[in-house]
Amino acid sequence: MTRMAWLGAILLTGHALPAAAQYASGPTFTVEASSDERRRGLSWSDGDPVVRATASVPVADGLSLDGAATSLWGSPRHGGADAVVDLGANYAKQLGGFRLTGEGRYHLFPGASHQGYGEVGAIAGFAIGPASIDLAARYAPRQSAIGGDNLYLSAGGAFAIPGTPLTLSSHVGRSSGDVRDPLVARRLRPGGGYWDYGVAIDWYRGRWSAGVRYADTDIDAPDSLHAGATLVSRVGFSF
């Protein structure tokens, strides 16, 4: 799919729906600083600190549009991009203790040419008291910017410690896919298919949040540059 086709699909999801916004709460905005931009175990910022701004706007019952902009400082992984802009739509449905979510997202890379790509996803979550479990599948169809297609399957859990502002979480994920251009496919899967995993502790107090996360992959050298074990710290403010 072309970049315009992806953007059109995402925007059409929420077209003509703002009038129904009374079914949802208001928009939320967050600014955050982080010691690294790690996604699926890979550093998108070449191991450098980043700043990020995110926004989520509800447009109907269960439906929201969201966007995020993150500094990348000339990321080698993404063709020297100065930033990544993530644009998406999410639809969530609560069924008893289960929460089902469908999403579509496009990643733009200002400062780099022919790097943008889109993906769709589905998440099934279940909550029991302060604990929750999520199973997710996200798929990027074949696109020249990623040298083929990409499938990411993951499982995660979180536990809000009663009586404290702390939440513990962990996840494991698997990246795989068809390769049409091996050199380009290394962008999202250096060395081929791989596992990533991590654990985190986050603190929430009012509009403030902070956290520390351990991230790692099973990618072997020499493909493991900025894909190995690391600690990532962050602090954020929402309004």
Model regions and ranges:
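Hydrophobic, lipid-facing positions within transmembrane beta-strands of outer-membrane proteins
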Residues: P27, P49-A55, V85-L87, L100, ...
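Short glycine/proline- and aromatic-enriched beta-strand/turn motifs that initiate or cap beta-hairpins
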Residues: A21-W73
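Transmembrane beta-barrel strands of outer-membrane/channel proteins
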Residues: F29-S35, G67-S71, G102-Y106, A124, ...
